Amino acid sequence: AEADAINYRAPYQSDPSMRKAINSASMKYQDIHLSHMGMLVQQNFIDVDVAVIEAVRITEEGNVIPSSAVGNNVEYMDAADKIIIEVNEWQSLELEGMHDIWEMPKLPNRVPIPITKPGDRIGTPYIEVDPEKIVAIVKTDEADRNAPFKPADEISEKIAGNFLDFLEGEVAAGRLSYDGYIMQSGVGNVPNAVMAGLLDSKFNNIQAYTEVIQDGMVDLIDSGKMTVASATSFSLSPEYAHKMNEEASNYREHIILRPQQISNHP
């Protein structure tokens, strides 16, 4: 974005330089529901000439083991004329087994997604790829570019407190249980404050459907409060990204990374 090298961006943005370019109309942008982007690529509404995909390794069978995100990689590789795979040696090989790759059938032949619980696994731990499309495999050793989260301020803590009071009211009304609470979490400092509040709550065996795994969710898993979380990627501070790399084999039992069409499906 800073080099003025991006013509079009979709379906999401959070980078200040990119936001500035979009607002100045020097970069085209479409704000698309995150579960729709893969479908639009799948249905040939968006062409993909070259897909650049990050992986932790490529198996002997030619399958791709994704790294800390799945996103729309399945659809991008299926649609692309050419594929470049970046094997990032900074990412832990122990991430293998954390992914659950299930490809949504094309319209008009869609079927119900066979997931009823956050911990359900319905696919494979790898992405199948046409080897004829691969034009390059590049080795790198680069950390994810993630900024640390700001400490929870007074407003964030009040919002988190109000939310936890609401949950307590739902338990008192008989609509919710302290055991097995299934939640959906957003992105940012306020959701992280809610996670911190849940650490000191009466809730146990928490399960989550979310878009990204953040620091607060890792703390809940460490505490034993959260048993499983379903997402499409990590959005961790540098400290927690390092922690994930060091302990990926443990977190693999509690985290499932899925294609974005699945993780963000309404």
Give the ranges of each region predicted by the language model.
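Conserved alpha/beta enzyme-core scaffold
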Residues: 1-266
